[in-house]
Regions:
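PLP-dependent aminotransferase-like
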Residues: 70-159, 166
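Phosphate-binding glycine-rich loop
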Residues: 31-79, 93-97, 103-105, 170
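Conserved active-site segment immediately N-terminal to the catalytic lysine
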Residues: 157-192, 220-224
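N-terminal "arm"/small-domain region of PLP-dependent enzymes with the aminotransferase-like
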Residues: 1-32, 37
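Short beta-strand-to-turn element immediately C-terminal to the catalytic PLP-Schiff-base lysine
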Residues: 181-182, 196-202, 241
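Structural detector of well-ordered beta-strand residues that form the stable sheet scaffold
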Residues: 56, 81, 102, 155-156, ...
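PLP-dependent aminotransferase class I/II
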Residues: 10, 22, 39-45, 49-55, ...
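Hydrophobic/aromatic ligand-binding patch that stacks against planar heteroaromatic rings
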Residues: 92-94, 147, 171, 188, ...
Length: 367
């Protein structure tokens, strides 16, 4: 019986090898390696895809979050509220500025930042809120925005896992003050290495981010502020332009597989993420909870199906943030997820027999 990977990038690379090869060879012939026209072209294409006025390509999603915080004036002494249930880079973007991430629990059903707990987290040091469209499912932007507006706070979208998702008919990446994307391999839109982007509507944010990522200068060798080497490589821009052409097709396929799992996995021991009707998820990850996730992962591995966890330790209990004083029980929903989560295989190139096998194994577990 063939092994089913949690994700298999080789199928896409092989299917579109000629297009990728042609793009890479163009960059090599022109030696357009650092920034340049291929990165700029992708910025325009990605802004058009998202529906934002601007997109500024950067070297990875973590840098995108850092730049967003800097552009919004976050610095030492400030606080920014972030979800406890997310990948750690969401918090890094705050910490890199010298500010403090304040971790908020997730809801028990969508597993995303819970607007009902935000008021208690706000202090006179709070500058804003980062919401994460986790696993490809848009968070409750309206609920978060209402609280943010009442307190004069910014809202940043972490869209690293949600390229093409929608909240109330609007694309993620166009909702908040700024939005951050990742193109890490395995993301719904991915580079051949690392990449990221910041999208926004305000020209002042766009120009500031462009300057910061380019060593703090608008004109070469004239540095107006301390900057960073966060540019998107030309090679990655060219690859991403190719990948972007296929993204709608990949998204449709992810949604087909995701909704198939929702309909056909009926084991009462398995709980799935809730998808509110006013959202359109893109199923970057298909995460479930089970009573004993290590046992479930072993069971699937015995049947040659690879599963893993997103994420085994919530942010507020990570060793790196011990100094903030969080304790077990501070974010109970996020902690429950960490102790029970499993990520099932899901990628656009999954074959019918693989999808059926995952469903059958899930339904047979402990039954």
């Amino acid at each position: 019986m063939a092994h089913i990977k949690r994700i298999d990038l080789t199928r896409d690379v092989e299917a579109h090898a000629d297009a990728y090869r042609e793009a890479i060879e163009k960059v090599c012939r022109e030696t357009a390696f650092s920034g340049g026209k291929y990165a700029d072209t992708f910025d325009k294409e990605f802004a058009a895809y998202v529906g934002s006025r601007y997109a500024s390509g950067v070297n990875n999603g973590t840098s995108a979050l850092h730049l967003a915080m800097l552009a919004l004036g976050v610095g030492p002494g400030d606080e920014v509220i972030v979800p406890a249930n997310t990948y750690i880079a969401t918090a890094w973007g705050v910490s890199y500025t010298g500010a403090t991430p304040v971790f908020a629990d997730c809801t028990p059903d969508t597993w995303e930042i819970d607007p009902s707990v935000l008021e208690a987290k706000i202090t006179d040091k709070t500058k804003g809120i980062i919401g994460v469209h986790l696993y490809g499912q848009p968070f409750d932007y309206a609920g978060v925005r209402e609280i943010a507006d009442r307190h004069g706070l910014f809202v940043v979208e972490d869209c690293a896992q949600a390229h093409g998702a929608q909240f109330e008919g609007k694309n993620v990446g166009t909702l908040g003050d700024l939005a951050c994307f990742s193109f890490y391999p395995g993301k719904n839109l991915y580079a051949f290495g690392e990449g990221g982007s910041v999208t926004c509507e305000k020209e002042e944010y766009y120009k500031h981010i462009d300057r910061l990522k380019n060593q703090g200068c608008d004109v070469r060798y004239y540095h107006d502020e301390i900057g960073y080497n966060y540019r998107l490589e030309g090679l990655q821009g060219a690859v991403l332009s190719v990948s972007l052409k296929y993204l709608p097709e990949w998204t449709k396929r992810r949604q087909e597989v995701g909704h198939r799992y929702i309909r056909e996995i009926t084991n009462p021991l398995i709980t799935m993420q809730h998808h509110p009707e006013n959202t359109t998820p893109v199923f970057h990850l298909f995460v479930i909870t089970v009573p004993d996730h290590e046992d479930f992962i072993r069971y699937m591995a015995e049947h040659d199906v690879e599963c893993n966890m997103h994420y085994p330790v919530p942010c507020h209990l990570q060793k790196a943030y011990t100094d903030l004083g969080y304790q077990p029980g501070d974010c109970p929903n996020a902690e429950y997820l960490a102790a029970h989560c499993v990520t099932l295989p899901l990628f656009p190139e999954m074959r019918e027999d693989e999808i059926r096998r995952v469903i059958e194994l899930c339904n047979a577990y402990r039954q």
